Amino acid sequence: MDIRAAEISAILKDQIKNFGQEAEVTEVGQVLSVGDGIARVYGLDNVQAGEMVEFENGTRGMALNLETDNVGVVIFGADREIKEGQTVKRTRAIVDAPVGKGLLGRVVDALGNPIDGKGPIQFTERKRVDVKAPGIIPRKSVNEPMATGLKAIDALIPIGRGQRELIIGDRQTGKTAIALDTILNQKPLNAQPDEKIKLYCVYVAVGQKRSTVAQFVKVLEEQGALEYSIVVAATASDPAPMQYLAPFTGCTMGEYFRDNGMHAVIIYDDLSKQAVAYRQMSLLLRRPPGREAYPGDVFYLHSRLLERAAKLNETQGAGSLTALPVIETQANDVSAYIPTNVISITDGQIFLETDLFFQGIRPAVNVGLSVSRVGSSAQTKAMKKVAGKIKGELAQYREMAAFAQFGSDLDAATQRLLNRGSRLTELLKQPQFSPLKMEEQVCVIWAGTNGYLDALPLGKVRAFEDGLLSLLRGKHADLLNTIRDTRDLSDDSAAKLKAAVEGFAKTFS
């Protein structure tokens, strides 16, 4: 066999001719100046607002200000490596995040990248982080309860699936503890096979210490709650753009469940820090400041985020996304700019007070100032029956307690009312990590409002409650099951409960 050189060279020339012709067209710009996490870029003529751009070292940024002569880009990462004169290229993609069930049990950053060291994420698809909220027609009024497992909230300030309920209070009043207990309370629901019953949880940590977030994730893991939760973390050491973006990323992950006929709850902890990060970005981008130096659109920042929590109607799959935003106040000032904004956007607020917290009333819920504007329609019949009474009695108690400080000679009726009120207040206390099921709460509150605690010394109320619950769980499980399944306290069940409580009260001393 002879090798013909001419033939081989012809073949090689033919192969080489088309090599390296796949040229890539990218629109680029140049960095004019960079500092404080903001880059001014010249060029990038056709860039869209909110588009991802990429710097030479691979760092991503987002185009926010589109001006006549330059583009203001916020940088998602450190700006140390970025120098004046470097090129910036368009990605032609608006900022998006991975969504899907593969994210459950994972901890991610504001861009959806894993930060828990458990390898890459198996996501279903990528979705834009900033999308329009559902309109009026796809929505439905809130009608299913979202149980937190806390007596003070489930009885007095009930939350429904698809509601937005604000948790507001000073630092160290137990705001995150309420959110954490709510996540832990969903464990029995998520153990069931029916997707309509499950409630997936998304926790967004904004501007918190890394140690705090690590502790939170550790508790979730120990309690077996991480498997149905997603944690999005943009900690205090992350750049402001990441802290601004994290709630939107978390919301997109939660919307995946809402739009696929499932249910999710998202906790933004906390939105004050997001507003501060957004203020920092806006001032550095030279946008005009407004009240408290926040930009004019800080209300829109929060309203467009919280409007995405919704209960959808049957034609849309009947899914829901419940939002529990957290706001930290300074010295109980609820009339500051951000707190008033978020109060006006949400469907109610749980107001936590330092004074109550230090008096040992935990959860430190101020029942007088807290409201739930739509949740009562989602309450179970059983809870409605027992909770209506406790609300009135506590309101009367608060009014009387204020007067009782001045006068010592009180008539018997007032004395009885004060006595009952203090015991009900004691009854609503609850230690952390011990959420109660709906039917258990109903029985305990029923015992309180029907006067079975009145004769007890205050210190014995907790012991009475624990004893009653263990008796009901042990010997009257059928009663608890009936209340749970019918979601109602029928006359028959009430009679059984009365017999059980009376029997227990006799033996308890």
Swiss-Prot record:
It is found in: Cell inner membrane. It is an enzyme of class 7 (translocase). It is a peripheral membrane protein. Its main location: membrane. ATP binds at G169, D170, R171, Q172, T173, G174, K175, T176. It catalyses: ATP + H2O + 4 H(+)(in) = ADP + phosphate + 5 H(+)(out). GO terms for molecular function: ADP binding; ATP binding; proton-transporting ATP synthase activity, rotational mechanism. It comes from the Bacteria. PROSITE patterns: ATPASE_ALPHA_BETA. InterPro entries: ATP_synth_asu-like_sf, ATP_synth_asu_C, ATP_synth_asu_C_sf, ATP_synth_F1_a_nt-bd_dom, ATP_synth_F1_asu, ATPase_a/bsu_AS, ATPase_F1/V1/A1_a/bsu_N, ATPase_F1/V1/A1_a/bsu_N_sf. The record marks S370 as: Required for activity. SUPFAM superfamilies: C-terminal domain of alpha and beta subunits of F1 ATP synthase, N-terminal domain of alpha and beta subunits of F1 ATP synthase, P-loop containing nucleoside triphosphate hydrolases. Its EC number is 7.1.2.2. Keywords: ATP synthesis, ATP-binding, Cell inner membrane, Cell membrane, CF(1), Hydrogen ion transport, Ion transport, Membrane, Nucleotide-binding, Translocase, Transport. GO terms for cellular component: plasma membrane; proton-transporting ATP synthase complex. Belongs to the ATPase alpha/beta chains family. HAMAP family: ATP_synth_alpha_bact (MF_01346). Produces ATP from ADP in the presence of a proton gradient across the membrane. The alpha chain is a regulatory subunit. F-type ATPases have 2 components, CF(1) - the catalytic core - and CF(0) - the membrane proton channel. CF(1) has five subunits: alpha(3), beta(3), gamma(1), delta(1), epsilon(1). CF(0) has four main subunits: a(1), b(1), b'(1) and c(9-12). This is ATP synthase subunit alpha. It comes from Bradyrhizobium sp. (strain BTAi1 / ATCC BAA-1182).
